[in-house]
Amino acid sequence: MSRPIDRTLETRLIEAATEWFAAFGFAGTRMEEVGRRAGVTKGGVYFRFRSKEALFFAVVDHWRDALRGAVAAGAGMGGTGADELEGALRGWLGFHAEHPDAGRILRVLAAELRAGFTAELRDDAQAEHRAFRARLRECLHRGGRDGSLDCGDPALTAFLLAGAAEGCVSQWLAAPAEAGAFRSPEALAEALVTPYRTGFQRDLAGADDPGAAFTPPL
């Protein structure tokens, strides 16, 4: 009698491998430990994934798909271009706040594999940055068309916003205790987008100018 198919094996291996790759990097991860964590032998891991590299890229693909889905869901909440921009940033930051190991996995790809492997990388570490910036540019262009955003150069603004969001995540990972007070995706996304909302600079100038409400005598 043939052995029943374990339909949860790949999910368990992805989860176990995520923990190991995030904690120990590519070189430090041992397939037998991944298997033990997932409840199978080392041979069981290789039965599903032909190599450690194949397992690693399965992990990368899993988290990339999840991240892009989170950004798309955030941007797809409706409203103006400004609302979509804030939603996209909120989705991206929220994903990394909920899944810190995913960010570490992408850093392993950038730090170890791009320099050390000659095998074709189906999508290099820069691809995720490009996809994120492209999504932000779409929102910025829409905000310019519907009048909800005033950013000047959408490409430059997307680059700055993506860099700011990435910087937030880097600080979360490097100094979680110190950055703990600044882990709200909602607050961060709002703070990043507000300066580009139409009328913000005018409102800010009016609030800061002590003579704004002064009416000169006739």
Describe every region a protein language model picked out:
Residues A72-A73, R107-L113, A175-E178, G211-A213:
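Short linear capping/connector segments at secondary-structure termini
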Residues G91-F95, R130-R145, A164-L218:
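C-terminal peripheral helix-coil segments that are non-catalytic and often amphipathic
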